[in-house]
Each structure stands twice: as C-alpha cells, then as structure tokens.
C-alpha cells in the first residue's frame, strides 16, 4: 500500500473523499483543499485515470517534523532518489509554505534540490538536470506548522486538463468544477436529460456526457507524472487503460441520454462543438445558438445545470439583475417538473431568481467563492400581461412603492427640465427611506448613487433593497438596463478614493442653459458635473459679462464655460488635477470657446492665492472641497477650520466693486461671519437663490455665499 494526497479546489473535500471511497481507497481523511488516502499501485492508477474531481495526486514519500534548514536537507537527502527517477530525467521542485526558518518558498526548494543532487552524486550516479518548465519528474514539498511533507507528483499536470479543450471562452469553467456541480447537484446519482442555456465552451455538458457514457476523464491525456517513475508498472497501467477504452466504447453505445446546450455567442458554440468532438461525445450533445431567455425545455423533465454570467465574468450589474430575475420568471412558467442547479459568485444575483432553494452550498471557482443552489420546480405559474415597452425592457413587479415614486417624479421633472433647457437632473434623492439612493438622469442614461446605510440595518437588507431598485428602475423609466450605472457613495480611503466604478466607458454630452459638457458616467465616482451647482453656475454666467473671472477648485471647468458664454472679458480656470484641467479644456472646445483670454492653470489653489495677491478679478467663484490631504498640498485642508483665512487672502484678488461667490458642500457648515467682517468683508447667504428644484428635497446639499468688500 502507498500513501497519497489528492489535491482539489477548496470546498471539494467531501465530494472527493466520497469518490475515493467508491474507488476502494482506504484511510481516507479530508484535509484543507484535498484528501489523504491509501491505495495499491493498481488502484492508484485507476484513481488517477478515473477521478473527476481531483486536481492532482501525489505519492507521499516523507512526512515528519522539521525545525531547521539542516533537518529539511537531511529529510530530503535520506530519500533514495535514484530508486524513484533516473539521472537521465530532468526534475523540478514545487515548494509550498513558509514559516519559522523558511522565509520564502525558493529557499525551501533550493535546499531540497541540493539534497536530491547530492544523493545522486554520493550514490555514484551523475546528477540529474533541473528543468522548471516541463520536467520529467516533479517533486512536491509542503511545509506547515513545523511539519514537512515530500511527495512525488503522481498524476502530472493538473487533472482538470482532460485533453479535450481546444480553446475557451471569456470565463472558462474548470472541468473538475463542472464535474463537482454534477455530483453535488445529485444528478450523477440519478442521471437524466441535462440542459445548459449558458453552455459557453460546453464544459458542464461534456462532463455530464462523459459520466453518462462511462468514459474515464483521463483517457485523452497525453502524459502522466508516474510515467518516469522507476517503479512504474507499464504492463499494469496498459491493462487498466485498455479496460477504460473498452468501457468508453460500450458506454457510448448504451447511453440513451441526450444533452442540450445553447449560448448567445456563435463562436462559443463552435468551440463547444469542437470540444465535444475531441472528448468523443459529440453525438450525445445538441448545441445551438440562442438567448437563454428564448430556450424552451426539450423534454418534460430534466436537469438544468449552469454557470450563468456574473459580475466577475461579464456584464453591467443592472443588466445581470434583470437577466437573473427574468430567468427565474421563465423557470417558474416553463420549467415545471425540472430541477435547476446554478453556480454564481454574487449572492444578490442568484437571489434575484426569486426561487426557493432546496439546497444552498458553497464552491470555489479558483479563488472566487460561489453559491451553488439547487431548486425543484413544480406547477407552472400564469404569465402576466405587461404594457408595451422598448425592446429589452421588462416590467418587474418589485418595490412597487419605489417604482410609483419614480413615475411620479418623472412627471414632475420632465416638463420643468425642458422649460429650463437642461437634460440632466436629480430624479430621486432617498425620497423613500428604505431605498436610500440618489438617482440622476443624464440625457438618456441613469446613474444610481448608493448612500452608506446606517449601521443598524443589516448588510443583507441593504443589498436586497439595492437589487430591488436595479430591478424595478428599467420598467419604471422605460429604459434599457445597459443605460443604468450603479455607484456606491460612502467614505473612501486611500487608493479607493478615486477607484474606477465600471469597466465600461460611457460618455455623453449634456446641455445646460445653452452650455455643453462632457460627462463620464462610468469612470470615477463623480461624472464631471455637480448637478446641485447648476443654478450657481448660471449665476456666474449671468454676472460675468465684461469681467475678468477667476474659477478656483474649478473641477472640469463648467462654471468657467458659463462665464465665457456669458461674455466674460477673460476666464482663468485653476485646479490641482491635470486630468480636470484637460477636461475643462475639452468642455471649452465643445462650446467653441478658444483664445488667449481663456487661461488654464494646474496648481495648488491655496498656494496660488498666496502667490498671486497682486492680480485683480471682478468676479471670483470658489468651490473648495470639504476636506483634503492631497500629497500635492503642503498642509491639509478643512473648509470649516480654514475658510476664513482662505477667504481673507482671496479677497485681496477681488477688485473694489467685485463679487466673490463661495460655495461648499459641508453639512452643518457655519460661516465665520465675525472674522470676515473684521477683515473688511461683507457676507450674504444666497442659498435660496442657488437651490435647483430637483434638490429642494435636500436643502442642505450646499452652502453658497456672496462676498464683497465692505462699504466704507
């Protein structure tokens, strides 16, 4: 008897242990990401050829305590390596684990390599060569909690590589994961017709066909690790291999099951057909190009097993939520009598099926933790009538109170927006407390900003409500899900502060009181235009005629554009971000504005104020951040703490009869009027003049003040 370890993805341990016991292995013991077992050489060959779940099988040669580099070397040296592989064969060492005296895996591998070549040399045999890429003989070593295990890679390359895959789609499903889905779903114990409406390159269906036809998954492999092992019994292996080939021939003849696969991508169906041909099961599987929502049950009872798309694979979250909801609806209506098994990494997506699971399990697709849910469908439900909507949009009867509020707001704001000559506005701002989001309409697109939920509300409840918003919104607005983007508004730290939200790039041009602006709806948290400052920007434009205008903390220069269109004599636009300065230049070009009178400066605005007190402007607009500790700034900035000092310096740049508009978005901001008056500055609050209709639900969104030199 030999001792082995069968490695597998995390979460496979129970299934793999059961499989090994069925093969006849003894001393079966589950471990993390694998199972220990004992077997004869003949059984080990069979397991290696027939296992559908293991990734790798290693023959354990040494196992014991190890506390020093010397012990590591001695343990490896004591192994009779010349009895395991010839000096004419190349070898490599995979070392896993660190701790104690082992700081890195390279050190451990080097020590074992030295011991191996020294053992060959001391036995009077030429030393074998090391080959890292494709060695003849692989040694596996693991070090954990002071225990060292040295093994021979018995199986060779990962066993999930069956040998039939020609190429893959965007998000390939490993063969042993597909097999485990079939095992854990209960299908393997009671095989019936299988349907996969998101079949991709066909892996689930091919694995099911291999099981049903009694075809060993290792038959197509070209190489196994034991082939260069000195104790390899070629005759025994050949008998086992020939037996498996005979079983495959007979199994395909006897297999009466049919398998059905479809995918919306024609090139994936071509790959799936090629893979099935390579696996020898093409005649058992019927592939077709089809949208999953158009697939119908090929038989009255069957098993739908699939790995549909989720966020890590492809797609916009709103589209995916819609897809999952529509799938669940379709399953209930058309798949009565079927079982459904779905693998998905996103709990909210799989919850959007709105089906009650018989079983809920966890599986790992690589490092990605996934939910694997099993459903039994009974009587069909009746189809509901829906009103006429744009293609791709579905009315979803979820969150009716929210949907009704959206419809009400659309009626209120559409006429107003047209009258105001704007096509971007806030449609909804946490009007209903349980749906704690802001929804902005940008031309024909919608951006949802999720506010941070109170700590008292469970995360699962928050996620469900967001899912309901995303599901209900397309129908309520009559727009396609791909025109909806979700962003999370919460406290950001470090590198996450400006993390890109969406891999898609959606840019639109919006119009506002005759001005045009470029928006990026999916790049960074902010789109390039603060809608709450719309009226303030118009005020700047109305006051700008014939004046020298200064715009500080200018962002993308939208207030500068209004000033230029309003007839400013000159406009100076300053921001610390070069990205925003370039964006401002684009906005000017978009409006046909060019010339020497428009100046763009990338600078620390606070330092620039100090360095340019000699300059004079008739109109100044400044909208600083609430807080900043940018590395480009010498000191941190807090608008409450520092505004009086900053405005006291800025007033020096204001001409005698000039006006300074100061705005910020700090809630509970308190203007230091006394300090400013002492500095010779008159201060007037103009919030009521600068609050747009679409922000009247949230009157504290910003603070706007008009400052002038005190009258003498």
Curated annotation (Swiss-Prot):
SUPFAM superfamilies listed in its UniProt record = S-adenosyl-L-methionine-dependent methyltransferases
Cite the EC number: 2.1.1.173, 2.1.1.264
Pfam families listed in its UniProt record? Methyltrans_SAM (PF10672), RlmL_1st (PF22020), THUMP (PF02926), UPF0020 (PF01170)
Keywords of the record: Cytoplasm, Methyltransferase, RNA-binding, rRNA processing, S-adenosyl-L-methionine, Transferase
* Localization per Swiss-Prot or TrEMBL: Cytoplasm
Q: What class of enzyme is it?
A: transferase
What does UniProt give as GO cellular component?
cytoplasm
Q: Spell out the CDD domains in the cross-references.
A: AdoMet_MTases, THUMP_AdoMetMT
Q: What catalytic activity is recorded?
A: guanosine(2445) in 23S rRNA + S-adenosyl-L-methionine = N(2)-methylguanosine(2445) in 23S rRNA + S-adenosyl-L-homocysteine + H(+); guanosine(2069) in 23S rRNA + S-adenosyl-L-methionine = N(2)-methylguanosine(2069) in 23S rRNA + S-adenosyl-L-homocysteine + H(+)
- Reply yes or no: does the keyword Cytoplasm apply: yes
Question: GO molecular function terms here?
Answer: 23S rRNA (guanine(2445)-N(2))-methyltransferase activity; RNA binding; rRNA (guanine-N7-)-methyltransferase activity
The record's NCBIfam families line, in alphabetical order, gives:
PRK11783.1
Give the similarity note.
Belongs to the methyltransferase superfamily. RlmKL family.
What name has this protein been given in UniProt? Ribosomal RNA large subunit methyltransferase K/L
């Amino acid at each position: 008897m030999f001792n082995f370890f069968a490695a597998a993805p995390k979460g496979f341990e129970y299934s793999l242990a059961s499989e090994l016991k069925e093969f006849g292995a003894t001393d079966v013991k589950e471990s993390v990401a694998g199972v220990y077992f004992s077997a004869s050489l003949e059984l080990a060959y069979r397991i290696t050829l027939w296992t559908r779940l293991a990734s790798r099988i290693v023959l354990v040669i040494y196992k014991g305590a190890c506390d020093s580099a010397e012990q590591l070397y001695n343990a490896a040296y004591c192994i009779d390596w010349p009895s395991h592989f010839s000096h004419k064969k190349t070898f490599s060492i995979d070392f896993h684990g660190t701790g104690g005296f082992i700081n890195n895996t390279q050190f451990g591998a080097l020590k074992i390599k030295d011991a191996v070549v020294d053992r060959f040399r001391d036995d009077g045999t030429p030393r074998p060569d090391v080959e890292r890429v494709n060695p003849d003989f692989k040694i596996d070593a693991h070090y954990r909690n002071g225990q060292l295990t040295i093994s021979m890679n018995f199986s060779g390359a990962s066993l999930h590589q069956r040998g039939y895959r020609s190429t893959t789609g965007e998000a390939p499903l490993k063969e042993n994961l597909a097999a485990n889905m079939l095992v854990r779903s209960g299908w393997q114990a009671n095989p019936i017709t299988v349907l996969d409406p998101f079949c991709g390159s066909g892996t689930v269906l091919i694995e099911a066909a291999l099981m049903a036809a009694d075809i060993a998954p290792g038959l197509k492999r070209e190489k196994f690790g034991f082939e260069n092992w000195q104790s390899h019994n070629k005759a025994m292996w050949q008998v086992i291999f020939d037996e498996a080939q005979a079983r495959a021939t007979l199994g395909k003849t006897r297999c009466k099951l049919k398998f059905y696969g479809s995918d919306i991508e024609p090139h994936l169906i071509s790959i799936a057909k090629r893979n099935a041909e390579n696996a020898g099961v093409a005649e058992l599987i019927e592939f077709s190009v089809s949208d999953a929502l158009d697939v119908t049950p090929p038989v009255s009872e069957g098993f739908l097993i699939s790995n549909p798309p989720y966020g890590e694979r492809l797609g916009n979250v709103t589209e995916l939520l819609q897809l999952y909801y529509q799938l669940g609806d379709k399953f209930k209506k058309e798949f009565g009598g079927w079982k459904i098994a779905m693998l998905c990494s996103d709990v909210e997506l799989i919850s959007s099926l709105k089906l009650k699971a018989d079983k809920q399990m966890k599986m790992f697709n690589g490092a990605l933790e996934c939910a694997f849910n099993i459903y039994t469908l009974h009587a069909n439900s009746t189809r509901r009538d829906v009103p006429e909507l744009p293609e791709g949009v579905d009315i979803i009867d979820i969150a009716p109170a929210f949907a009704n509020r959206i419809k009400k707001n659309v009626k209120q704001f559409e006429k107003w927006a047209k009258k105001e000559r704007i096509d971007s506005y806030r449609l909804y701002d946490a009007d209903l407390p349980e749906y704690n989001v802001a929804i902005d309409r940008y031309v024909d697109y919608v951006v949802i900003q999720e506010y941070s939920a109170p700590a008292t509300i469970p995360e699962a409840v928050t996620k469900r409500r967001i899912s309901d918003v995303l599901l209900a919104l397309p129908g309520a607005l009559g727009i396609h899900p791909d025109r909806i983007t979700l962003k999370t508004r919460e406290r950001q730290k470090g590198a996450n502060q400006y993390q890109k939200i969406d891999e898609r790039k959606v840019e639109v041009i919006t119009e506002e009181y005759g001005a045009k602006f470029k928006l990026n709806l999916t790049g960074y948290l902010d789109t390039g235009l603060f809608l709450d400052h719309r009226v303030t920007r118009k005020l700047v434009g109305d006051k700008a005629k014939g004046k020298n205008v200064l715009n500080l903390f200018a962002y993308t220069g939208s207030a500068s554009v209004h000033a230029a269109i309003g007839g400013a004599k000159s406009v100076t636009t300053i921001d610390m971000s070069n990205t925003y300065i370039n964006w401002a230049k684009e906005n000017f070009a978009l409006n046909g504005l060019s010339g020497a009178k428009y100046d763009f400066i990338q600078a620390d605005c606070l330092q620039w104020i100090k360095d340019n007190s000699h300059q004079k402007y008739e109109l100044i607009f400044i909208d600083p951040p609430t807080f900043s500790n940018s590395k480009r700034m010498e000191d941190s900035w807090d608008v409450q703490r520092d505004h009086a000092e900053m405005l006291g310096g800025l007033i020096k740049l204001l001409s005698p009869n000039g006006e300074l508009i100061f705005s910020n978005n700090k809630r509970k901001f308190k203007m230091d009027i006394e300090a400013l008056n002492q500095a010779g500055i008159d201060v007037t609050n103009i919030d009521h003049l600068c609050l747009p209709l679409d922000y009247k639900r949230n009157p504290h969104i910003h603070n706007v003040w008009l400052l002038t030199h005190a009258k003498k």
